[in-house]
């Protein structure tokens, strides 16, 4: 089974790190990267092509 590719976008570092830590414990999820604002999220989404983007 192919892993779900996730990008995390949040302006709070501790939230990004916490979500990433939780998601990395799941075998079927791959955290592609993190973004600290909307512009960075758009840039990374275009470059990394995630299946899911978690944003606040």
Can you name each region flagged by the protein language model?
Residues 11-12, 38:
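Generic detector of well-ordered alpha-helical packing
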Residues 34-43:
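Helix N-cap/capping motif at the beta->alpha junctions
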Residues 27-28, 37, 50:
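Short, conserved catalytic or interaction motifs in soluble domains
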Residues 10, 56:
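Active-site residues of response regulator receiver
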Residues 5, 13-33:
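Two-component/phosphorelay signaling modules centered on CheY-like receiver
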Residues 48-54:
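Active-site beta3 strand of CheY-like receiver
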């Amino acid at each position: 089974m192919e892993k779900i590719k996730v990008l995390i976008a949040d302006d709070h570092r501790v939230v990004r790190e916490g979500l990433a830590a939780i998601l990395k414990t799941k075998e079927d999820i791959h955290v592609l990267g993190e973004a600290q604002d909307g512009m960075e999220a758009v840039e990374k989404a275009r470059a990394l092509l995630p299946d899911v983007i978690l944003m606040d």
